[in-house]
Design a protein with these regions (language model features):
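Catalytic, metal-anchored helix/loop core of enzyme active sites in primary metabolism
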Residues: 49-51, 57-120
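Substrate-binding/catalytic subdomain of NAD(P)-dependent oxidoreductase enzymes
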Residues: 1-74, 79-81
């Protein structure tokens, strides 16, 4: 929730806090349910979203059932993927493979700053 709020503030001028992020844990998915999903070619991943709406910015972190061959599902373990859906460049993304604490927060912010500087 904290990372979602920070990114929304930086990229979308959301002026929000982690408390405003809708949250749902992944704990409701039992091992049996995960096996059923795998047999059907699906997986469950914890996905963070920031979406602009007519009423402002909607922020959420919740489990989503994804196709195993999809881009979001391809990220394994503690790795993370950031996708930005832009007006002019379409969808751009960055992935961090097995990041540590420093890489997760600072690295992501630094990379985004570089991207914004490049496209400005």
């Amino acid at each position: 929730a904290a990372k979602t709020a920070v990114l929304a503030n930086v990229l979308l001028d959301a002026r929000t806090t982690p408390k405003s992020v809708e949250r749902e844990g992944i704990g409701a998915f039992t091992e049996e349910r995960v096996r059923e999903l795998a047999a059907a070619g699906q997986t469950v991943c914890l996905v963070s979203r920031a979406e602009t709406t007519a009423n402002g910015v909607r922020l959420s972190v919740r489990p989503e059932i994804l196709d195993q061959t999809g881009l979001l599902a391809s990220v394994q373990g503690t790795s993370n993927l950031l996708l930005l859906h832009t007006d002019l460049m379409g969808t751009v993304g960055t992935v961090s493979i097995a990041p540590g604490v420093d890489q997760t927060a600072y690295g992501l912010f630094s990379d985004l700053a570089d991207i914004l500087e490049t496209i400005s």
